[in-house]
Curated annotation (Swiss-Prot):
Protein name per its UniProtKB record: tRNA dimethylallyltransferase
Function summary: Catalyzes the transfer of a dimethylallyl group onto the adenine at position 37 in tRNAs that read codons beginning with uridine, leading to the formation of N6-(dimethylallyl)adenosine (i(6)A).
Intrachain S-S bonds: none
Binding site for ATP: G13, P14, T15, A16, V17, G18, K19, T20
Tree of life domain: Bacteria
UniProt-listed HAMAP family: IPP_trans
Top enzyme category: transferase
Region (Interaction with substrate tRNA) location: 38-41
Gene this chain is encoded by: miaA
One example GO MF annotation: ATP binding
InterPro entries: Dimethylallyltransferase, IPT, P-loop_NTPase
Reaction(s) catalysed (UniProt annotation): adenosine(37) in tRNA + dimethylallyl diphosphate = N(6)-dimethylallyladenosine(37) in tRNA + diphosphate
Length: 316
């Protein structure tokens, strides 16, 4: 353990690569408890589209931050960090090892580093002004909104894909509230590690991964994904931010009979493959991850290697 910091194991990798299975088997082997790092698995009723772990798959291993909110409730990197930090402390005090399974790059980064979240107080008048401006911007297309961000913060615009509307809006809102550029803030922040973190990455060749993604989408549909989306829409969640997640937004037009189901499925597969590619790029460029090829290395071998590294850290 480094400088008395709690040990934290984080398992990252692209969608459909096998993080869930690895995290559960590792938890069983080392006495771990799992904290989901997924921003959508927190929502009740969004099960099939998020490949949410089932009670049977958990095999008795404790899981946290799953099914804790309704789809219309907000969830952010800051909210994740607050909840996860508390859980890590509790798990460590029980003598177990906390394992973060999956998650977006920002969520993981905000947790393992002393990542600052601005809490600047602004007047009610300014708050209302920003709220009205954001409401106006909501009507813009993804491209137009991205161009607006580019007009005052080109570095953030370059870092954020135009289709990642949530992050674009976050960068715009940050500027409107603080008159500071999010990109400048990121460049000037000095990160301090909160934990003795072992970052484990799972990967495989693009060809194999894309095949797995396509098969997973087909399996989701066979298990009722379309019906899950329709049920969420019937409950009034259609316009919620959570429904903009991959696996849901693509099927809404199909449920509304605006496009054929096969066209929606093709979009879902394409978006999932694109997302997997972005995930790999982010983790390989931004974080010091120890990678294992899941297609080339057996699960027992990976588990033995991770266990050996954990033992080494505990002894150092």
């Amino acid at each position: 353990m480094t400088a008395n910091k709690p040990l934290l194991v984080v398992i990252v990798g692209p969608t459909a690569v096998g993080k869930t299975e690895l995290s559960i088997e590792l938890a069983k082997k080392i006495g771990g408890e799992i904290i989901s790092g997924d921003s959508i698995q927190v929502y009740r009723g969004m099960d099939i589209g998020t490949a949410k772990v089932t009670k049977e798959e958990m095999q008795g291993v404790p899981h946290y931050l799953i099914d804790i909110l309704d789809p219309d409730e907000p969830f952010s990197a800051f909210a994740f960090k607050e909840r996860a930090q508390k859980l890590i402390t509790e798990i460590t005090e029980r003598g177990h090892i906390p394992i973060i399974a999956g998650g977006t790059g920002l969520y993981i980064q905000s947790l393992i580093y002393d990542y600052p979240f601005d809490k600047e107080e602004i007047s009610p008048e300014k708050e209302q002004e920003v709220k009205e401006k954001m409401a106006q911007l909501e009507s813009l297309s993804n491209e137009a909104l991205h161009d607006y961000l580019k007009s005052f913060d080109p570095d953030s615009a370059e870092d954020i894909h135009p289709n990642n509307r949530k992050r674009v809006l976050r960068a715009v809102e940050y500027y409107l509230k603080t008159k500071k550029l999010l990109s400048y803030r990121k460049k000037t922040v000095q990160f301090t590690e909160n934990y003795d973190t072992l970052l484990i990455g799972v990967e495989m060749s693009r060809e194999i991964l894309y095949q797995r993604i396509n098969c997973r989408v087909d399996s989701m549909l066979e298990h009722g994904l379309l019906q899950e989306v329709e049920q969420l829409m019937n409950q009034g969640y259609t316009s919620c931010q959570s429904m903009q997640a991959i696996g849901y937004k693509e099927l809404i037009p199909a449920v509304n009979h605006e496009i054929p189901i096969n066209q929606a499925v093709d979009k879902l597969k394409q978006h999932s493959r694109n997302y997997a590619k972005r995930q790999m790029t982010w983790f390989k460029n931004k974080m010091d991850v120890q990678w294992f090829d899941r297609a080339q290395t057996s699960l027992p071998l990976i588990l033995d290697e991770i266990t050996a590294r954990i033992k080494k850290r505990r002894e150092s």
